[in-house]
Design a protein with these regions (language model features):
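Active-site and ligand/interface coordination hotspots across diverse enzymes
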Residues: 1-45, 57, 166, 171-173
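Amphipathic coiled-coil/heptad-repeat helices and related helical stalk/stem segments
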Residues: 14, 47-48, 95-98
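Hydrophobic/aromatic beta-strand patches that form the interior of the parallel beta-sheet core
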Residues: 30-32, 64-66, 113, 138-140
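Short, well-ordered beta-to-alpha junction loops that form the rim of enzyme active sites
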Residues: 33-34, 68, 116-119
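Acidic, metal-coordinating catalytic cores used for nucleic-acid/nucleotide bond scission
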Residues: 38-40, 70-72, 119-123
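Short catalytic helix/loop segments, enriched in acidic residues and glycine
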Residues: 48-56
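Short connector loops at secondary-structure junctions
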Residues: 61-79
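Glycine/proline-rich loop-helix segments at beta-alpha junctions forming the active-site rim
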Residues: 79-173
């Protein structure tokens, strides 16, 4: 049974959660990336398909996708423009609402794969201060800086298995 759902704003500009389930009896993987693109409650995009393929290969029954920023953009430059025009995100209601969804998904996930890519070097503040089971945090590969987790559409082998993050300032900057 394939289940698809998403939590998207009424204006359709922000996505807070994306879920794909193919086996409810198996565990779930959360992928945390930079920002959502076109996937929604019905349609998958390339990133979603890649995450599904990784999770199936690892024996999981579903994925959740959350993002550091909730703004839906196909290109990094569109996100940068939104960030520049938006101002202080840490006081923005969409950002705060998004972080509350991320917190919930992190706690529900059996495995968390950090995968936001090189457009956001280092680690976001909400992960540094969160009260999470840190053993859940993993990555596929790190970017050339040795700190930032690569995005699933990066130049990655399809045979990768998640590696555990050592969440501290020495690893994440």
């Amino acid at each position: 049974m394939d289940l698809k759902r998403a939590v998207i704003s009424d204006c359709n500009k922000y996505r807070y959660e994306l879920h794909r389930t193919w086996d409810e009896k198996k565990k779930k993987v959360l992928f945390i990336m930079l920002n959502p693109s076109t996937a929604d409650g019905m349609k998958d995009d390339l990133t979603t398909i890649r995450c599904i393929n990784f999770a199936k290969k690892w024996g999981y029954g579903g994925i959740m996708i959350g993002n550091i920023y909730p703004f839906r953009a196909k290109r990094p430059k569109d996100l940068r423009k939104w960030l520049k025009n938006y101002g202080d995100l840490y006081n923005a209601s969409e950002y705060d609402y998004n972080i509350s969804h991320l917190h919930d998904m992190i706690l529900k996930a059996d495995l968390v794969v950090c995968a936001w890519g090189g457009n956001h070097p280092g680690i976001p503040d909400f992960l540094e201060i969160g009260e999470y089971p840190l053993k859940k945090l993993h990555y596929l590969e790190l970017c050339n800086d040795g700190i930032t987790p690569k995005h699933p559409l990066g130049n990655l082998s399809k045979d990768l298995t998640p590696k555990r993050h050592k969440l501290n300032t020495n690893v994440f900057g």
